[in-house]
Amino acid sequence: MSLNPVIFSIGPVSIYWYSLAYVLGIVFAYWYLHKLDDQKIFTKNFYDSLLTATIVGIILGGRLGYVLIYDPVLYISNPIEILKTWEGGMSFHGGAIGVLLAVIISCKRHNIPTFYALDLVSCGVPIGLFLGRIGNFINGELFGRVTTMPWGMVFPESGDNLLHHPSQLYEALFEGLLLFAVANSLFFLTRIRLYHGALTGIAVMWYGIARFFVEFFREPDYQIGYLWLDLTMGQLLSIPMVLLGMLVYLGALNLKFNTKSVT
């Protein structure tokens, strides 16, 4: 399977599907926040601040996370490669930290309840995750392990001409579409939105569990391979995510993180 990662080129400038996926994900999340904030807690200045901070957080956090965690030797020896984000190489965990900091900073600056904002962000972000994984699929990167399943695909980047799990699509489904469905069902159909932070905790737990599971079908990064207990780096990073999500969820229910309530 080989798809052209470039949408079109104008002279030396090329527009990539992977880059477009990030842009569409951010645009959707920005639009969706307006729809979810039916009580109009967010101000225009907050939206503008959050949008700018989120873009910076995603790019810097995602790229630096990948550079520092997955392939530091390569980028230290070829630092110019750090700037080539359109070729892939973004860490979700690094990007998540960047978005978290963006939300916290923006909320503090504009006196917005942080966990209220995080809950709403958790409802929109999964579509960005879905689009990002589709971008990975088009790039032919982050493919799965060798399989005999009829839906296996040959990825030229693997260099072995064997069938591999399309693990990018598994992640798009479990970490993107299903998380979007679960988060929004809870938001609209239950009273969980009254416990600020509870939905954030559930979303973080869901992603961590989904990522841990899908990693069993995903080829580990060649420069890292298998680590402790034959787990991948993605799995090891997902374990603290699950624990953190559980802590936030229980805290929202029992410690009343929503001290500044919005009713």
Swiss-Prot record:
GO molecular function: phosphatidylglycerol-prolipoprotein diacylglyceryl transferase activity
PROSITE patterns, sorted: LGT
Binding residues for a 1,2-diacyl-sn-glycero-3-phospho-(1'-sn-glycerol): R133
Membrane-traversing stretches: 6-26, 50-70, 85-105, 112-132, 169-189, 197-217, 233-253
Entry keyword Cell membrane: yes
Annotated InterPro entries: Lgt
EC number: 2.5.1.145
UniProt family annotation: Belongs to the Lgt family.
Annotated function: Catalyzes the transfer of the diacylglyceryl group from phosphatidylglycerol to the sulfhydryl group of the N-terminal cysteine of a prolipoprotein, the first step in the formation of mature lipoproteins.
Name of the protein described by the UniProt record: Phosphatidylglycerol--prolipoprotein diacylglyceryl transferase
Origin species: Wolbachia pipientis wMel
Gene designation per UniProt: lgt
